[in-house]
């Protein structure tokens, strides 16, 4: 693997591992799947193919971030809007 791509792949792995800490099925589950995915592609040597895989990994990062933001939004909505609804019903 070429040096610049190697650093990109390592950074991608670290970022995914960090994001996996909050994965709904648990960090251990995510870590095992992540390791398996990277090990499956460890023999890829074509720089274009490696870049394509890195781009796919970055897409996964964006999807995970969206999942986490949605989960936080739902928790906040549940926390605040249910209180507001219950106070409105008590007033009326």
From Swiss-Prot:
The keyword Mitochondrion applies. Keywords: Mitochondrion. It comes from Salmo salar. Belongs to the complex I LYR family. Acts as a regulator of the electron transfer flavoprotein by promoting the removal of flavin from the ETF holoenzyme (composed of etfa and etfb). This is Electron transfer flavoprotein regulatory factor 1. One of its GO terms (cellular component) is mitochondrion. The gene is etfrf1. One of its GO terms (biological process) is negative regulation of oxidative phosphorylation. It is found in: Mitochondrion. Its main location: mitochondrion. InterPro entries: Complex1_LYR_dom (IPR008011), Complex1_LYR_ETFRF1_LYRM5 (IPR045296), ETFRF1 (IPR052000).
């Amino acid at each position: 693997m070429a040096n610049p791509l190697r650093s990109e792949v390592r950074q991608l792995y670290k970022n995914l591992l960090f994001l996996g800490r909050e994965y709904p099925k648990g960090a251990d589950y995510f870590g095992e799947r992540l390791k398996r995915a990277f090990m499956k592609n460890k023999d890829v040597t074509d720089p274009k193919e490696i870049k394509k895989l890195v781009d796919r990994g970055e897409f996964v990062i964006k999807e995970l971030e969206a999942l986490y933001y949605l989960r936080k939004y739902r928790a906040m909505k549940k926390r605040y809007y249910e209180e507001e609804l219950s106070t409105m019903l008590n007033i009326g």
